[in-house]
């Protein structure tokens, strides 16, 4: 089902209580205002829609909302209307101003479909396409997963205990690590992934998950 989050913000600003209107205005300013946003506990508590923080290629932290959820994929929109698409927490496509992740195949076999069931040594192979300095690249990427201890993820004043999942990825030309912070229910609370082969890091921190 498609859910246009930006329209939802507009509806929130037109109706509901003064408190909700103030929240809507605050989030609107965060979405289209200065990067590096940090929402307050009240903002997070009253959040009416799915959202997360993202950091692109070492840039400032952005507040990102879920624009659409369809066919098992979630499409997140940045404050400058760039789009990042995830599936089961994995970045699978981007529409940014510069370089992009073009595609990832074999997603039906991705162990992240059920992260809590991953065992050390689990593996996955796929083809990925991306642009690097505007040049199109394709490679076969091979992943090996292992658990790497425990941690906590903090959003506002709330701390969630998590297990850390390490994904070692290799192609014929490069090797890198993606990492995922996963709670007791199998929800990916935080991640560090790469748009290409050891190129263009993307960090995510979940604020509010989309409804299943």
Swiss-Prot record:
Q: Please state what the protein is called.
A: Uncharacterized lipoprotein YjbF
* Residue numbers with lipid attached (N-palmitoyl cysteine): 16
Q: Give the similarity note.
A: To E.coli YmcC.
Gene3D superfamilies, sorted? YmcC-like
Q: Which gene encodes it?
A: yjbF
Native source organism of the sequence: Escherichia coli (strain K12)
**GO (cellular component) term, any one:** plasma membrane
Task: Name the keywords, alphabetized.
Answer: Cell membrane, Lipoprotein, Membrane, Palmitate, Signal
Database matches in InterPro entries = GfcB, YmcC_sf
Can the keyword Membrane be found in this entry's annotation? Answer: yes
Q: In its keyword annotation, does this UniProt entry include Cytoplasm?
A: no
Subcellular localization, as worded in the UniProt entry: Cell membrane
Membrane topology label: Lipid-anchor
**Signal sequence range:** 1-15
Q: What is its main location?
A: membrane
Where are lipid groups covalently attached, annotated S-diacylglycerol cysteine?
16
């Amino acid at each position: 089902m498609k859910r246009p989050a930006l329209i939802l913000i507009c509806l929130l600003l037109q109706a509901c209580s003064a408190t909700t209107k103030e929240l809507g205005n605050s989030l609107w300013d965060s979405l289209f205002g200065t990067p590096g946003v940090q929402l307050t506990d009240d903002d997070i508590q009253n959040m009416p829609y799915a959202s997360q923080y993202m950091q692109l290629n070492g840039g400032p932290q952005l507040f990102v909302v879920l624009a659409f959820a369809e066919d098992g994929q979630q499409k997140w929109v940045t404050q400058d209307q760039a789009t990042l698409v995830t599936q089961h927490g994995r970045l699978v496509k981007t529409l940014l101003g510069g370089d992009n992740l073009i595609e990832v195949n074999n997603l039906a076999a991705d162990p992240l479909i059920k992260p809590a069931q991953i065992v050390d040594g689990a593996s996955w192979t796929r083809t990925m396409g991306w642009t690097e300095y505007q040049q199109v690249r394709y490679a076969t990427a091979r992943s090996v997963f292992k658990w790497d201890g425990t941690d906590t993820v903090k959003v506002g004043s709330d701390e969630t205990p998590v297990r850390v999942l390490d994904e070692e990825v290799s192609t014929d030309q490069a090797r890198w690590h993606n990492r995922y912070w996963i709670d007791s229910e199998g929800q990916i609370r935080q991640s560090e992934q790469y748009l290409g082969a050891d190129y263009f890091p993307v960090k995510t921190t979940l604020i509010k998950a989309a409804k299943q």
